[in-house]
């Protein structure tokens, strides 16, 4: 199964088996960088077997319509994963909603790549997955993430104390959302 979304500098694609070693490399390279923003890692997370299974599960979840996971790669280095964008907990019916998550390699921060990736990913899930709303939550101390979401048009919905177990403790989060102004009511029937 293939899904390729292109932007000016990036390729966004569903996880695929040939890139499983690159995904493992991304997470090993960025373990310390991502730890403050990540939930506990499952057993085997640092193994190729885990990432091969992750590919299979991601493709099944995509086919079921419950998750869209996208691996980020630069067009100039298409075999290296530099980040990921995920739309999970997709709910259809009268909700038509997903939860956004994202991460980027520490050496690629500050170059506008995540903003570029999120713009394309959001455009895809709004138009092709026919979603009405995307929720995104971030820790208050992650100021960069808050600024990124605001630039993308996300609005603050509220504050959630002890919301997620992240970096070894229950952490407060700021809840935000983005509404698809182009959503059409007939999508409720077809989604």
Identify what each model region corresponds to.
Residues 43, 55-71:
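A short helix-loop-beta-strand connector motif used in the catalytic cores of GNAT acetyltransferases and
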Residues 1-22, 26-36, 69-191:
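Acyl-donor (CoA/ACP) binding surface of acyl/acetyltransferases
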């Amino acid at each position: 199964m293939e899904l390729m979304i292109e932007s000016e500098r990036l390729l966004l694609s569903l996880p695929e088996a040939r890139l499983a070693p690159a995904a493992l490399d991304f997470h090993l390279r960025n373990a310390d960088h991502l730890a403050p923003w990540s939930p506990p890692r499952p057993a085997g997370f640092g193994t190729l077997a885990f990432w091969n299974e992750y590919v299979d599960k991601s493709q099944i979840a995509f086919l079921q319509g419950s998750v869209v996971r996208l691996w980020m790669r630069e067009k100039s280095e298409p075999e290296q994963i530099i980040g990921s964008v995920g739309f999970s907990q997709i709910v259809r019916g009268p909700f038509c909603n997903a939860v956004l998550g994202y991460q980027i390699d520490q050496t690629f921060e500050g170059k506008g790549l995540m903003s570029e990736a999120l713009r394309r990913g959001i455009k895809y899930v709004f138009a092709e997955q026919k979603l009405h709303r995307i929720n995104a939550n971030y820790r208050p101390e992650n100021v960069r993430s808050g600024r990124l979401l605001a630039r993308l048009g996300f609005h603050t919905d509220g504050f959630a104390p002890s919301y997620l177990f992240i970096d070894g403790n229950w952490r407060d989060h700021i809840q935000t959302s983005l509404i698809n102004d182009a959503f059409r009511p007939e999508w409720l029937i077809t989604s």
